[in-house]
Regions:
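Structural marker of alpha-solenoid helical repeat scaffolds
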Residues: 11-12, 46, 80, 114-115, ...
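Register position in tetratricopeptide repeats
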Residues: 29, 63-64, 97, 131, ...
Length: 199
């Protein structure tokens, strides 16, 4: 696959940009960040308006820890194609890294409007509300999440924990027990259920 993509490097700028974008992504997945960055640069230089190339460039910059610069690449990708969900998702993650929680939430809420049943987006929104110390909103978004992935034991145990923190032991028991049914090896869940039964 790499050899085939490398053949396209000699083509016109759009084809070269697409090939370099794919090569950058492949190297990124293989954790060869230097090569990924080189091909991301080639992709962006070949076609500055390619949102996938800009997103890949943002990913390589993000992986090197320069979150502000990564955010700029993601924003540029979105200016070129406002429907680039990868750039919007990664911009939200970048804002979370930068502790710009309100901006991260805004990104994920926009994504939710586009991708209504995306488990990843719902989980990010719930997590942000948890970071904002708003357990009621976190619970509401986790409830939407379990309508998409009803057997996820980690989401169920997270709901149990939030209800427990809110003092609702019966709901906490329900979600911890559901979590236990799907993943009976989680020690934290077993300990909570044991303590609940002793009380």
């Amino acid at each position: 696959a790499l050899e085939t993509l490398k053949m396209f490097e000699k083509k016109d700028s759009r084809v070269k940009s697409a090939a370099a974008t794919n090569l950058s992504f492949l190297y990124y997945l293989e954790n060869e960040l230097a090569q990924a960055a080189n091909y991301a640069d080639l992709a962006v230089n070949s076609d500055r308006y390619n949102p996938a190339a800009l997103t890949n460039k943002g990913n390589t910059v993000f992986a090197n820890g320069d979150y502000e610069k990564a955010a700029e690449f993601y924003k540029e990708a979105l200016r070129n194609d406002c429907s680039c969900t990868e750039a919007l998702y990664n911009l939200g993650l970048t804002y979370k890294k930068l502790n710009r929680i309100d901006e991260a939430l805004d990104c994920f809420l926009k994504l939710h409007a586009i991708l209504r049943n995306s488990a990843q987006v719902l989980q990010q929104i719930a997590n942000i509300y948890e970071l904002m110390e708003d357990p009621n909103q976190a619970i509401e978004w986790l409830m939407q999440l379990i309508s998409v992935v009803p057997t996820d034991p980690h989401v169920l145990s997270k709901l149990g924990k939030l209800y427990d923190n809110e003092g609702d032991k019966s709901q906490a028991f329900h979600y911890y027990y559901e979590s236990y049914r799907y993943f009976p090896s989680n020690i934290e869940v077993i300990e909570w259920l044991g303590a609940y039964c002793i009380d």
